[in-house]
Amino acid sequence: DLHKAIRRQRQMCIRDRYGYDISKQAINVAKENAKLNDVPAIFERSNLFEDVADETFDVIVSNPPYIRSDEIPFLMPEVSEFEPHEALDGKEDGLFFYRKIIQESPDYLTDGGYLLFEIGYDQGWAVSSMMKEAGFEDVCVKKDLARNDRVVCGHKHLCEKRG
């Protein structure tokens, strides 16, 4: 569960934690959650990697918008009425942001660094295939408690710099 994961992360020897989001509201919520859970972190506004300094990261975790544009009108009201549209819309096929992040992330990952995504239940194959095609290694899909594909992860090949 999330609370256990946060507690475990607090105990790990992690030097710096950064959080980026295009939404100011999401950043404020993240700051409050970090404070409540005593997790030191720096949160900044950025559209993907646009405003990320020349940093490299050991791990990048992303939960991008992944719902296809044509599915949004049919979402449950508790989702569509309360979540900002930009937090939901993954464009035409729901994979737009995965493509961008997979393409750009190697420039921001240390050699051997990990990229992890939350995905929609039907996107495991597509996202894992894109990561493999981009040169990520040991790509795997993890299931959630309902046994749906939920996370795709892989690591950057050692000594590879894209550009």
Task: Describe each model-derived feature in a short phrase.
Residues 18-162:
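S-adenosylmethionine
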Residues 1-10, 14-16:
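Single conserved hydrophobic/aromatic residue that forms the stacking wall/gate
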